[in-house]
Amino acid sequence: VANHGLVFAWGPQSHKVIAYIAELNLSPEAKKYIVEEFNINNLADVAIWADIIRKKRKNERPWHYTNIKEGEWVYVQERDCPDSNCLVEKIKTFSKIVADTHTLFIERRDALKYLVHFVGDVHQPLHLGNLKDRGGGRIRLFNSGKNVSLHYLWDGGLIDWEKENLVEYATHLNSRILDSEKSEWLFNFTPYLSLADLDAGLSLI
């Protein structure tokens, strides 16, 4: 969550792990379509693209988070994002662009790259919150003797990435997801999209 233009983001490793998990849950047809239609062999290769270009496109910073009114627990678009310039609404927007074969190739390809990243962002709980604690940035605690923010820990500070193989870690995490959970994520639409919705969106093409 951000304030006055300040934006926190999942670390590169976290985004790539999420992208690997997403790819493990794509149908063979959807995976083939991504390769042939968009020339993207691995979703992890484009997982941090939106963070890279955000440095130059400051107007896109609000796309990486959604602020929900303090005291509320459910996202309401009319109240929380009336201009549609937030993470939740951008996921919806780019999902439609990816599925629209009448849209220019470069726009659809960029939309897919945004989607891979933003679905990762929305799975970081502190990207959906209120401004009061700046997405956990103002909550300080000690971890391994270091004074760090709660947001830092969520972004990857709890994992020693130097000791982790990203593909193996993603495979391990994916193995812990029940088939019933995947089905629920796929068919039970929530205010934000789950990883499985990428597959569902592509199936409409």
Language-model segment annotations:
Residues 8-118, 125-205:
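N-terminal, motif-rich segments that launch catalysis or mediate targeting to/interaction with membranes
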